[in-house]
Amino acid sequence: MFPSAHSRFIYFHKENSNPNYHAYDDTRFQVIMMSGLPGSGKDTWIKENLPEYKVISLDELRQEMGIEPGGNQGEIANAAKSLAKEYMRAGESFVWNATNLNKQLRGMLIRLFAAYQAEIRIVYLETSWLELLRRNKTRTEKVPEKVLYRMKNRLEVPTVVEAHRVDFIVN
């Protein structure tokens, strides 16, 4: 129906857009936004599929900054956004590695990335609940099971209208 992925993206992200309008693709670089519960395989997928990309990992920033998971997450988010802006100003592609569990949070980031002319790709990973719990037990930074359960209940699977491209990977 849409002339291009960029035209579809523009249609769903700008008011009063026409689905037949062939939008000029002014994207300059790519941002890959990971999405999925802890233990779904995001880090492994990045290493196997995008080893050459720079990665902004909120988990790694949390560790580097010495902030506990229950601590001030705003500082981590601000540091991550600052790094992302640096990459985007330079026109460098990168991976935004976080859980990105709900549409509202993804939307805020997508608007930021689009403002810098990014082509946005969401990679959503999913695995069975039992496998998720098994992987969590072997993690260095384990997530309490009740927290995982809460996250699972808040999860909103991305839709194809959120980005230029959305990949669904079930493993």
Kindly label every feature range from the protein language model.
Residues 90-91, 116-121, 161-166:
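Short glycine-/polar-rich loops that comprise or flank the Walker A/P-loop
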Residues 83, 109-111:
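Aromatic/hydrophobic pocket-lining residues that form π-stacking "cages" and hydrophobic walls in ligand
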